[in-house]
Amino acid sequence: MQITILGSGVIGVTTAYYLAKLGHEVTVIDREEGPAPETSFANAGQVSPGYASPWAAPGIPLKAAKWLFQKHAPLILRLTTDPVQYRWLLQMLANCTDSRYKINKTRMVRVAEYSRDCLIELRKDTGIEYDQRSQGTLQLFREQYQLDGIGKDIEVLRQDGVPFEVLDRDGCVNVEPALAHAKDKFVGGLRLPNDETGDCFKFTNALAKIAEGLGVKFRFGVNIKSLLMSGGKISGVETSEGIVTAERYVVALGSYTPALIKALGLNAPIYPVKGYSITAPIVDESRAPVSTVLDESYKIAITRLGDRIRVGGMAEVSGFTDDLPAARRATLDLSVTDLFPGGDLKAATFWSGLRPMTPDSTPIIGGTRYDNLFINAGHGTLGWTMACGSGRLLADLISGNKADIRADDLGIARYN
């Protein structure tokens, strides 16, 4: 089949790769000049299925109220005049119950675990390189109450068969030796040994080259204007270079997905939740991380990517903004200086990206009421973690193959 994919981030490119592997004729269209220059460009770098948890969780409304008054808060809410923002926030609040949390987390872990397995298989098949490490991730707790409160998460990990280790200070230093100088800054940690790390931007660009070798065509610098409809199905894509036609269409435009499909009567409550990162060259190996360390107090991930340290995190609900406030940079600097001062922060690059978040934190993967239109978007903070699994799952659904995991509860129908 001829299939057109809209979007060349990590989700769009992985989808293209898996469709091409199944023998389809694939074209990818994007307004940018190459793969992954936006949200996939400088994320935290972790592939962490075990930490796949909804932002909408019991207790979050109270925590969010407290964070409003903290200088280095992990969540920043900047209200706009856009009614879409308010509707999304209300939908998110509706998911902050025990029952919804369990449903949403189960779905997220299902996709994330499958995706990690797909990534490992892809790596074996292609030999792709992207500063990858398979040395687990460590969630670090600065306060005793944080360590005492992980019982619910451990229960879910145990039920899902995810290996884990609860570590004291010495145990944390054993897996991340550079923490020896900061033992007074934390009380313990939760380690997931099967998690991985890697540079999402490098991966996406390398996979795009591999996909080209399978026949995928990339059309960069092309603006997508609208989807055209005829006879109850999609008949083409109106672009700045004319109308593009295919037999099947995939929308993988992240936070920009809702605007494109709204005219078709489809509701995808995906809202941009802004994240920040800095990337610094390592100048002191003895004070740099081995893998990824999650600073629970600030919700920041500190990751080793080759000869660089990537520090990323926070969640800012402020609409489609791309500014780089000094206050956000200060929070990233504070966390990494406290724990891993082995990077040259003066030489660091500062970045922000718009994570496409659904109110239930679960991505939208699957078909629509239009037989030839599919969605792969809304992965929030876990786009890198879920990319390979999402791409392979959708490729199977489009091809009519039996999916490896349950997919009926991942589609847009849950909102329409």
Swiss-Prot record:
GO MF term (any one): D-amino-acid dehydrogenase activity
Superkingdom to which the source organism belongs: Bacteria
GO BP terms, alphabetized: D-alanine catabolic process
InterPro entries: DadA, FAD-dep_OxRdtase, FAD/NAD-bd_sf
GO cellular component, as recorded: cytoplasm; plasma membrane
EC number per UniProt: 1.4.99.-
Cofactor(s) listed: FAD
Catalytic function, reaction form: a D-alpha-amino acid + A + H2O = a 2-oxocarboxylate + AH2 + NH4(+)
Function comment: Oxidative deamination of D-amino acids.
Entries under HAMAP family matching the protein: DadA
Protein name (Swiss-Prot/TrEMBL): D-amino acid dehydrogenase
Gene name of this polypeptide: dadA
